[in-house]
Regions:
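Conserved Lys-Pro-Asp/Glu-containing loop-to-beta segment of HAD-superfamily phosphomonoesterases
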Residues: 3, 93-116
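Alpha-helix C-terminal capping segments
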Residues: 19-22, 54-60, 104-105
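Short, acidic loop-to-helix structural element flanking the phosphoryl-transfer center
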Residues: 31-65, 74-78
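A short, structured active-site edge motif that brings together acidic residues
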Residues: 66-72, 77, 81-104
């Protein structure tokens, strides 16, 4: 079976939905580093059709979630795990890989919002 990795931010997870839930006074303190706001990754909604799409892929591929977390936001690591448990369930959370070097993961396919 072929392996497919699916990114979280802006693929499974609607990053702007989390930003919208942060009070303006907190946002102002982080400027262009909103991914460093503690707890932001726990505030995000799924992208439209993301859950159904992930479930479809999981039926047809050896599917993993491959994401990165900001170095300066330690809660992001646990928040991402909790997000996967909440929206994708127990089986998916055991298939979560957090890495700053996605290129080190051997894979047939990668669904990611970044092109490089």
């Amino acid at each position: 079976m072929e392996t497919i990795y699916v990114d979280m931010d802006n693929v499974l997870v609607d990053f702007p939905s989390g930003i919208a839930r942060i009070p303006e006074e907190i946002r102002a303190g982080y400027e262009d580093r909103l991914d460093e706001v503690p707890g932001i990754f726990g505030l995000m909604d799924p992208m439209p059709q993301a859950i159904e799409s992930y479930e479809f892929l999981a039926q047809h591929f050896d599917t993993y979630i491959l994401s990165t977390a900001p170095w300066h936001n330690p809660s992001a690591w646990s928040d991402k795990l909790l997000w996967v448990q909440r929206y994708l369930g127990q089986a998916a959370y055991k298939r979560l890989i957090l890495s700053h070097h996605k290129n080190l993961n051997d894979v047939h396919y990668l669904i990611d919002d970044r092109t490089k």
